[in-house]
Amino acid sequence: DCLGWFKSCDPKNDKCCKNYSCSRRDRWCKYDL
């Protein structure tokens, strides 16, 4: 199970879906460009 767009996340334990990454500043999953 992974976190999708705009889901809140922990940068130290990034569980965002493939092609997403946890933003340290905003603390939600953002699309990786």
From Swiss-Prot:
Task performed by this protein: Potent inhibitor of hNav1.7/SCN9A (IC(50)=16 nM, tested in patch-clamp), and modest inhibitor of Cav2.2/CACNA1B (IC(50)~3 uM on rat and human channel). It also seems to be potent on hNav1.1/SCN1A (IC(50)=2.18 uM), hNav1.2/SCN2A (IC(50)=0.13 uM), hNav1.7/SCN9A (IC(50)=3.34 uM) and hNav1.8/SCN10A (IC(50)=6.92 uM) (tested in fluorimetric assays, which shows results with lower activity than results obtained by patch-clamp). This toxin inhibits Cav2.2/CACNA1B by acting near the pore region, but without overlapping the omega-conotoxin binding site.
Localization of this protein: Secreted
Source organism of the structure: Ceratogyrus darlingi (Rear horned baboon tarantula)
Single annotated GO MF: calcium channel regulator activity
Note: Negative results: has no effect on some calcium channels (Cav1.3/CACNA1D and Cav3.1/CACNA1G) and some sodium channels (Nav1.3/SCN3A, Nav1.4/SCN4A, Nav1.5/SCN5A, and Nav1.6/SCN8A) (IC(50)>30 uM for all channels) (tested in fluorimetric assays).
Leucine amide PTM positions: L33
Principal subcellular localisation of the protein: secreted
UniProt remark on domains: The presence of a 'disulfide through disulfide knot' structurally defines this protein as a knottin.
Any one GO cellular component localisation term in the record: extracellular region
InterPro entries: Huwentoxin-1, Huwentoxin_CS1
Annotated protein name in UniProt: Beta-theraphotoxin-Cd1a
Tissue/organ expression: Expressed by the venom gland.
Keyword Secreted: yes
Family from the record: Belongs to the neurotoxin 10 (Hwtx-1) family. 04 (CcoTx1) subfamily.
Keywords for this protein: Amidation, Calcium channel impairing toxin, Disulfide bond, Ion channel impairing toxin, Knottin, Neurotoxin, Secreted, Toxin, Voltage-gated calcium channel impairing toxin, Voltage-gated sodium channel impairing toxin
Residue pairs linked by disulfide bridges in the UniProt entry: C2-C17, C9-C22, C16-C29
